[in-house]
Amino acid sequence: MRHIILTLLLGSYTLAFAQNKIKGEWYLYELFGKKTSMEMYRLERQTKEKRGYKINFIENKIFIASYFSSSKDDCSPSTRGVYEKINRHYVSFHVDSFSVSGIGCQMNYEGIHADLGKFYIHFPSKGVLYLIKSTGDLDYDKQLAQDAEQINDINSIAKYVFKRNGENISYNPSFKEEVATYVAQVLKLPHYRVCLKFSVGRYTGDVALVKDLETGTYFYVVKDNAAQQEATQKENKYFHFTSEELKK
């Protein structure tokens, strides 16, 4: 009986400790919860950016995500919802509403009521948190979290994509399937994994992280706007780059 009580107390302590690590304000490159298809969020306790997005996990299991800027004239979109720690590995999210406010902006409020499902919690280092959309397999979620650590400089990725593509905010429900076709036909990788789909800002659209399972090399795959405009409707044009290319 004493062993059972100790086990329950330890479980409660572990759950409370993990939840306390999440609480507070974090910065990220995407408005949390607006895109219900997001598979990965990278959050940081601190930022040097003058504008972007942040999320605050409040004591009473409420989260508020919003846009921040040094300019008072910017419109500020925000989402609001609830979060709940399931266990030490997972947290679930439900988005209740989306709104826009700001000087000179058309006020907008929209009830969303979207269940985002559960996300795997990964703390690779102090002040950094990855939220990985769960696949239902803990071991595989852990592997995806390790893959996600490659995405450690989202700002550089955003600049690279924007320089090549300009604005690209179209939604594509077949994105990962088209990426898989591109990897097989263009990169010609015999063994690979399309790890995660993520966003690097409101203007640059979706990016896929792909791993070559034979060499361990990671590729970023993005839709090619310029090539797509010249292609037929049945063609889907993409381009790719590696982390090494970001350093050039």
Describe the predicted segments one by one:
Residues 18, 147-150, 160, 182, ...:
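Short stretches within intrinsically disordered, low-complexity N-terminal or propeptide regions
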Residues 219-248:
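A short, surface-exposed interaction/processing loop segment used at functional sites
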Residues 19-78, 90-166, 214, 245-248:
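Lipid interaction determinants
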Residues 1-22:
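Bacterial Sec-dependent N-terminal signal peptides
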